[in-house]
C-alpha cells in the first residue's frame, strides 16, 4: 500500500512538470534584452574548432522577483549558472561552441524568458 502511494505521488509530480522546450529560433519576451557573444580563448591561438568562452548579457524590465537559471540546450538542460539580478553579465568557462543554445529561465515559474545560440567564434586577424 505504501509503495502504491509513493508511486502515485511520483506520477502526479511528473504530470505537473512543464514540457521540455528546445528552441529553434532566438527569442526573448517583451521587455527582455538577452545577448550571447563568442570570446576568443585566453590561452593559445584562437581556434573556432576548439571550445571557447562566451559572454552572456541580460536586462529585464519589470520582473517582480528576478531569479534566473542559465541552461544549455533546452528547458531541461544542464544548469550552468544562476543569478538573482534583473541586469547583468557573465562570462563562461571555455566550453561554448557555435550553435549551442543558452536559455534564460525564470527559476520560480520555469518560464522560458529568452534563448540564443552561441554565435561562431571570429578570430582576430593576425
Residue ranges and their predicted role:
Residues 1-8:
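Sec-dependent signal peptide recognition
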Residues 12-15:
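C-terminal motif of bacterial Sec signal peptides marking the signal peptidase cleavage site
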Residues 17-19:
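Bacterial signal peptide processing site
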Residues 24-25, 110-126:
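Edge beta-strands of extracellular beta-sandwich domains
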Residues 50-56:
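Structural beta-strand segments of beta-rich domains
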Residues 60-67, 97:
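Short proline/glycine-enriched turn/loop motifs at strand-loop junctions of beta-rich domains
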Residues 79-86:
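Short beta-strand segments within Ig-like beta-sandwich modules, predominantly Fibronectin type-III
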Residues 91-101:
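Surface-exposed, short loops/turns at beta-strand junctions within beta-sandwich domains
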